[in-house]
Amino acid sequence: MLLLTEHYWFFNGGRQIPEADVNDPEYADLYGPAAGITRDMSDIYDNPPTEEHMQDWLVRTCEIVDKYQPSIVYFDWWIQQYAWKPYLRKFAAYYYNRSAQWGKETAIDAKFDAYVYGSAVNDLERGQLDHITPDLWQNDTSVAKNSWGYTIGNDYKKPSDVVLDLIDVVSKNGALLLNIGPKPDGTIPEEDAHILREMGKWLKVNGEAIYGTRYWKIFGEGPTVVPEGHFTDTYDKHFTSEDIRFTRKSNHIYATVLHWPEDGEIHIKALGNDMKLLKSTIRDIEILGTDLHPAFARNKELDISCGRGVIEAGDMPVVLKITVE
């Protein structure tokens, strides 16, 4: 459930239209009233909302919790303003205590350190991290590069782009919140549905490398740099066969090859002898979605030989399930 604090000033645009109902005093309770943008948005101490507005926000937000028992409450930006801090704490206490009464696991998503680490999920809008964090984080993004909603002429991502982002995010202890934009009649555009179906096909085969896994000692290896920060996930990432991402579960390490090589030869530095990251013995390697258990040798690197043309992955990543003992 998406909740907003920036509506204190966000209806400013409507203030420019004389006949808009945002200017009608009769609707002041609905719109805030709309304050207009007169502040420096980067200054968390600048011109805070009124006490009346923040009290009203808290009551409304708690009312939503009681009415709908949301599993996740997602706060968009501007919530990091210093004046909101006492109200954020009050809301978190109320929501988490109510969740305990319901016997339900819940979470708060927030940006820009609005909540202290460990009390909410840190969210990056259309962005990723370049490292592992011990606290769960989230990348919220969309199937289109240019829009959050249905727009004629949307610049859609490729299904493989979304899958690759998912793998990278999970390897760094993150979660992916993926948006699609329905048409006005509620139907899902075919372009959106195609991306979801292709993701589903990949996850049906390789989901065990994602669901219920944890991050490994390092998130991965390879030459391709994933930029960190908000609004960075639309940059083209040209992954190579040297780009690997790791997850783990039980006695398995999942090494996802982000671009499968034509010759079928894989070399993983982190699982070789030189880096000394893996102390266990490798018992078996399986390529998910196949019956193949390729030959391997653990030298300076972990060298895996699958043979040319054996795997036809296209632009989708391939998962190696590595069993250790």
Task: Annotate each language-model stretch with its function.
Residues M1-E325:
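Mature catalytic domains of secreted/periplasmic carbohydrate-active enzymes
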